[in-house]
């Protein structure tokens, strides 16, 4: 059997790469495109996860909760952009402070409502298949497919009139305004889209993780690592960074503890970030 030949569960590595891609795609909109140091990104992942849990609690359907999670997160994101962030573009230190404060408010609010006790979102499929000798939960396969679909969807939208308007505002807001594009509306839609994707990521990842008010923090650092290493604003760079970081972490976890594996991945990301300018000069 291939499981006796392969040193690691190859599909688990692929699933981890998809997880890195999924949680960082929302940050690609706010940090990569809008240049917002978005420390509340993890809490929008949290909002999506708890939306799925709450809908499951009310109606007994985690799948319905997953469908509504990105809508709720996007609406919360649009509200946050309108009230707090809109006046802080081009002021990165101020956005850092505001998003950090908002993350604390959301996290503590969720803890007050749901307590710190762990919650669980039910796997809507709860089945598995054999893949090269390994038992693969079908829900992880769903996560991989959705992550790929979101990237393809973004690449397609990027070539439409809507995508051109978005890129125009990101590149030169003043010129875009002169051409009749409402930059405020575009920024709100971009930020809301990023929050919606973060909420979807949280809802999709909730069934394979224990849910708590600290849930979003698990993904915040890795999201920033992927976007920064892949070059902010570059979807292709983000794909490569997800493969490198997620793949490295997935392989290392089979040989050493997760804590040490994460430390090594962080060190690799720092080294790669430092070497990139030198490689460009060469």
Where are the regions that the model predicts?
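Pore- or pathway-lining transmembrane helices of multi-pass membrane proteins that form conduits
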Residues: 43-47, 88-111, 216-228, 256-273
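Helix-loop-helix "hairpin" substructures at the membrane interface of multi-pass membrane proteins
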Residues: 16, 132-211, 235-240
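Transmembrane helix-bundle core of multi-pass membrane transporters
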Residues: 83, 87-159, 186-189, 256
